[in-house]
Amino acid sequence: MVKHVLVAGAGASGLMAAIAAARSGAKVTILEAMDRPGRKLLVTGNGRCNLTNLDPELSSAYHGADPVFAKSVIEQFPPEKTLDFFHGLGLLTTDRSGYVYPYTNQASSVLEVLLTEVRRLKIKVKLSEKIERIFREEGQWKVQTATWTYPCDSLILCCGSKCMPQTGSDGSGYALAASAGLSVHTPSPALTPLLCEGKFLSSLAGVRCHARVTLLRGREVPVASECGELQWTKYGISGIAVFQLSRHVSCASKSERFAAEIDLLDPYSDDEVLSMLRTRALALQQEKVSAVLRGILPEKLIPVIQEKAGIPVKMTCAALDEKSIDALLHTCRAFRLTITGTKDFDTCQLCAGGVDLSALSPETMECRSVPGLYFAGELLDVDGPCGGYNLQWAWSSGYVAGRHAAI
């Protein structure tokens, strides 16, 4: 007997689940709440879609209550199989130091090859169909929308998380999972900018620079450190290095306090920077101190650094003594910001938290206590770093769920 599989959600994991189920012989229907499929996929990687990552330790890079679960799922459908899958759909890819993108550099190419395969496999796609209720009746799953009740043998929930609700991820999948008896770890924004104190921040909005950002608990205890592009905003700091650290803040208790220590000189040593500062100050005696810093820092950062270091904006290099040079070095090396929180679900790229994995089988993605109910993607309590890790989770979990839902 041919199984009828219904997939809730036409995002990355949902499209993969539907294709895997159809290739395994099932009749497949996708229900999508939005007016077109793959809206979030189109904006991933700033519209370029970082498909996966060839990091050899990728399967161990995920967060959540049970990282071993994610590792087990990823190993069933690793990045190598993801590349084979997309190459088989006619998508050329390019590898940039392990970060894999479509050769066209366009997320739309990824979505189009997926939708072409959906059409080839005669998978039905019902758009603008928001699921209101799921329930078991007469040995089948019933999926109720405002317009229809769809019966199916297996149901795969790929409804997404709460992040970027404008793309369709409004968090409604958590309620559907809860209605089936599953627990949900409270979602928090992840891969998101940090909110910080500082009146000077408005003057730095839009400034980008290379930096190492260290997250401190209580201003003293290092939690984690990341290096990369830092973007200053009117409300705090952003950029990939900040995104990687943000989950530690959003997942912490409200009573915990954090600070960011920013090294604006990474990877240069103290001796290298001191030598340059001394040499340039000696050569530019009649110039303002800012002249020495222009080859080191973005222009808008210079007055902020000088103020933090206690050096008047109008001071000339002739007045720059060893103590002042040390103050400049220290301020650039350990610029402190008090963190007040993170941006919200509208802004974050991912959620930490989600459906509790302990109720699922990592071999099949099926709920152990509720037969025929499967899960994949962001809805689950799995989140990874920037760089293709989270799309790989979508491909892997979607593939495993789809294949087993069809059996």
Placement of each model-derived feature along the sequence:
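A glycine-rich dinucleotide-binding beta-alpha-beta segment and adjacent secondary-structure elements
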Residues: 127, 303-383
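Glycine-rich FAD pyrophosphate-binding loop
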Residues: 22-46
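Feature captures the FAD/FMN-dependent oxidoreductase FAD-binding
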Residues: 76-154
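N-terminal Rossmann-like FAD-binding beta1-loop-alpha1 element of flavoenzymes
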Residues: 3-30, 401-406
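Short hydrophobic core segments
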Residues: 6-8, 31, 131, 150-166, ...
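An anion/pyrophosphate-binding glycine-rich loop and adjacent beta-alpha core
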Residues: 35-37, 42-43, 51-58, 92, ...
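Glycine-rich active-site loop/strand segments that organize a redox cofactor
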Residues: 46-97
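Glycine-rich loop(s) and the adjacent beta-strand/alpha-helix scaffold that form part
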Residues: 154-200
